[in-house]
Design a protein with these regions (language model features):
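Compositionally biased terminal segments of proteins
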Residues: 1-178
């Protein structure tokens, strides 16, 4: 059996374009999501947290077929029904659809906290870390200190600029805050 290529951002780009064209609602999650934010790691697959609905599942199937994935009927049914975890190894690279990631309460909440990194909708690093911690898998637990360090640096670089009380009041139209 030949070894699968490791994750490359180009694969995420392919998925992002296909998913946008098909109208799929999703976030990149897991280590591949962190890599898209600049994390210096490697992984073997693209991890995707899709919104769980029959319609979204059908759009996922159409999008993956469009970029060369062979989706047989049993696999299609798992995707359309939103099975908690679906591994897809029948395409140009490996994809994990995680409809119910450990440690994350709901897709709408995660999406509201998510980040837009160029064309990539990515789960917030805190959600990625919470999911890895909740999974309890040894390989995820080993990665946690590195992900936490990366998160701290990422949040420092992407923090909104500090504003004075006067600036905040002025933005609200309250001029008596001096």
């Amino acid at each position: 059996m030949s070894e699968r290529p490791e994750f490359r951002p180009l694969q995420a780009e392919e998925i992002a374009r296909a998913f946008k064209h098909a109208g799929v609602d999703y976030l990149f999650i897991g280590k591949s999501g962190a890599i898209l934010l600049g994390y210096p790691g490697t992984t073997q697959d693209v991890d995707i947290f899709p919104e769980r609905s029959e319609e979204n599942g059908k759009r996922i199937v159409a999008a993956l077929r469009r970029i060369g994935f062979e989706i047989a009927l049993p696999l299609e049914q798992e995707i359309v029904s939103g099975k908690d975890f679906v591994q897809i190894k029948t395409g140009p690279f490996d994809v994990d659809l995680v409809f119910a990631p450990d440690g994350i309460r709901s897709f709408p909440e995660a999406k509201a906290r998510g980040l837009a990194e160029g064309i990539f909708p990515v789960a917030n690093l805190r959600d990625i870390i919470a999911s890895k911690r909740a999974s309890g898998r040894q390989k995820d637990l080993i990665e946690l200190p590195l992900l936490e360090s990366f998160r701290v640096e990422f949040e420092k670089r992407h923090a909104p600029p500090l504003r004075s009380a006067a600036d905040i009041a002025a933005s609200r139209g309250d001029e008596s805050a001096d």
